[in-house]
């Protein structure tokens, strides 16, 4: 009788331990799901900020291109004014090469984001289930659902990371173009100011 009682106690302890492990496993999947959802929200916020930053860079580049066009017109007016006053044209004809318009330079600009591609492993995992069933109870059902959502969100996070990388590369190239345009515009403005100062001094 004592052996039978000991065995019942041992089975009860094992069942209690199994229940405890089941509860801990379920709580772990809940924490995992919460963490990946927070990561997804952070990724969405980052993509929104990158999109807003891209729009700002577009406006800056358009502004630089407008300055370039305005300087082309200003240089032409200075040349016409110099000729009208009978002055020798300054050796600023070299600036003619700087009169190009940059507005249509779209090198490296991504006009659309890459399409979403579902990984075969994700599809298999979703269709097959993520845990080996032991008790087949509600806890295991929830664990399986949680892990399915975790797998789906992780797949989305991978695609979001690719989108972020592409957008950052595009914006880095755009920033390089803007810096080149700013340097060119500054040089042309300085040289135009020198021409105007000379003409005023000669007058």
Curated annotation (Swiss-Prot):
Biological process according to GO: synaptic vesicle fusion to presynaptic active zone membrane; synaptic vesicle priming
Transferase as UniProt keyword: no
Principal subcellular localization: other
Gene designation: snap25b
All residue ranges annotated as the t-SNARE coiled-coil homology domain in the record: 19-81, 137-199
Taxon lineage: Eukaryota, Metazoa, Chordata, Craniata, Vertebrata
Keywords, comma-separated and alphabetical: Cell membrane, Coiled coil, Membrane, Repeat, Synapse, Synaptosome
Residue ranges, annotated region (Disordered): 1-25
Name used for this protein in its record: Synaptosomal-associated protein 25-B
Biased composition (Basic and acidic residues): 1-11
Secreted found in the keyword field: no
Subcellular location: Synapse, Synaptosome; Cell membrane
Family according to the record: Belongs to the SNAP-25 family.
